[in-house]
UniProtKB/Swiss-Prot annotation:
Belongs to the RemA family. It comes from Thermotoga maritima (strain ATCC 43589 / DSM 3109 / JCM 10099 / NBRC 100826 / MSB8). Pfam families: RemA-like. This is Putative regulatory protein TM_1690. Transmembrane segments: none annotated.
């Protein structure tokens, strides 16, 4: 239950669909990105900037972001805590 997460430049991803947020520098991730492109499952949300993170979804889509993985992870946690806070308040 994470809601929508901002991944940069006005782009958002459904938090509940994300499996991993990783650094794109390793060879296996570069191959995964190339395979996703061939399969039509690559989404480039970098707006021409350097890819700093790769987001892997439960539907095997690969999303490229120009935001650092740590920053996106922090946004996940902020959204999670905000949703939890709202749920606690509505139960009172």
């Amino acid at each position: 239950m994470y809601g929508l997460i901002n991944i940069g430049f006005g782009n958002v991803v459904a938090g509940d669909r994300v499996i991993a947020i990783v650094n794109p520098e390793s060879s296996p991730l570069k191959r995964m990105k190339d395979e996703a492109k061939l399969e039509g499952k690559l989404i480039d949300a970098t707006y021409g900037r350097k890819t700093r993170s790769i987001i892997i979804t439960d539907s095997n889509h690969i999303i490229l972001s120009a935001i650092q993985p740590e920053t996106i992870a922090q946004r996940f946690m902020e959204n999670f805590y905000e949703i939890e806070r709202v749920l606690r308040e509505t139960k009172k």
